[in-house]
């Protein structure tokens, strides 16, 4: 992915889903550049939370934690992710998807996009953080991520999948359930 003018707009720099302030949003956008994540994830299945955003938000959290301390990172990242995920699972349309399907398309898309945002920007970073704890901490997770991003790519399907991540961690989907 490439930075463009949209990354420097007031709206983008104040997006609290990407960081606690403009500087942290810039960290988020630069992390996208670092990993080249836009090309590493298959975005065709929007129903799963595994995406460039989840890993980017997690990585931003790690940088912010190192820079501003664990308390700041907990308050401005982990606690906010958890609150959003808790609210997600209480959401009427998540609990009653048939009602969502009955809405007019424009409303359905707006709600679906909002719900997808929570899964990608909040649920996935929490799952990666849980994986970090289960594999033995930050250094272990750093080794796993380094291995995943330096892996031999399959030219037929070069994307990093959630199953690739789980396999590298020695975990299952059930291990990362947040309930």
Task: Map each language-model feature to its residues.
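Active-site-proximal or metal-binding-adjacent scaffold patches in catalytic folds
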Residues: 1
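Zinc-dependent metallopeptidase catalytic helix centered on the HExxH motif
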Residues: 4-89
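Short hydrophobic/aromatic-rich motifs at helix boundaries and adjacent loops
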Residues: 26-28, 96-103, 133-137, 149-150
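A short secondary-structure junction motif
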Residues: 33, 37, 66, 88-96, ...
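Short, charged low-complexity intrinsically disordered segments located at boundaries
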Residues: 64, 86-95, 158-164, 178
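Amphipathic alpha-helical substructures
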Residues: 71, 107-110, 114-179
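The feature captures the short pre-catalytic strand/loop hairpin that immediately precedes
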Residues: 92-114
